[in-house]
Amino acid sequence: MKTALKPWLLAAAAACVLGPGAAAQAADLAALRNGGTLRVAIANEIPYGYMDLNGEAKGVGPDVAKHIAEALGIGKIEWTTTAFGSLIPGLQADRYDMVAAEMAILPQRCEQVLYSEPNSSYGEGLLVAKGNPKNLHDYENFAASDHKIAIMAGADQLEILQALKVPASRIVTIANNADAISTVTTGRADGYAATSLTVGELAAKSRGKAEAARDFKDPVVDGQPVRSWGGFAFSKDSGALRDAVNQELAKFKKTEDWKKIMSGYGFSAEDASQSFERSTAQLCAG
């Protein structure tokens, strides 16, 4: 479901820049409710969090964040887009108060930021050139051959590939998803590792030049298929804001409106159900 932004929502097309000495400060919930502006960052990644052609924030993260902000009595949101790898540093440098990019909740990230409870859950995918000329169907193929696999800088696919013993020499790092199609169609890499939803979106945008690998097999690490749980992220000093968001998120996830947002952006009923299967405490513990 794509909900329209309310007139009072503000959009910023690029991240604001602070000096090198900037440090994270706790977002004051009372001030936000009293006319303040909630600064929210996304990584311009469909369907998780992105700016559309009208400069409006869309995606499962922004749509749910808008509902939560309204429920908390926060009247203004300023949206910032930045590279995925800059999301956590931006929180730490007080460039924004919250990240709504459905960033996977991982132990190493939990050491750097606070997470809400999961808002979403999603599996993996593989983008390949049209016709899948190298016959690639899983990430393990890249550990057992000389083929190269691309990932986005800062994405958790790096940890997955490392766990599967894919050599660093076969991993190509690109700045963002926008470069993925050209990366696989020009042969710079033989595949692009990303979530299944991202891969599907890229394949649709490629105009037939690339496709999602068919019969893709989810990677298995430590005997378990890999699945990610995404949540909202905050600076370590923003516990009060995180707790307030958690309260409203728990309520909203019980509604049909939340389910419609998930399905509207391509999440399956299983994805929605899986989002309840892990807590942030469990995910942070590893």
Kindly label every feature range from the protein language model:
Residues 77-89, 134-137, 171-186:
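Short helix-initiation/N-cap motifs at beta->coil->alpha
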Residues 130-148:
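Flexible hinge/capping segments at coil-to-helix
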Residues 38-39, 74-76, 93-101, 146-148, ...:
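Alpha-to-beta junction loops
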Residues 62-71, 132-133, 140, 155, ...:
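Extended ligand-binding regions for polar small-molecule ligands
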Residues 51-53, 65-75, 140-143, 155-175, ...:
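Ligand-binding cleft/hinge of the Venus flytrap
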Residues 86, 102-111, 160-163, 190-226, ...:
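A ligand-binding cleft/hinge motif common to bilobed small-molecule-binding domains
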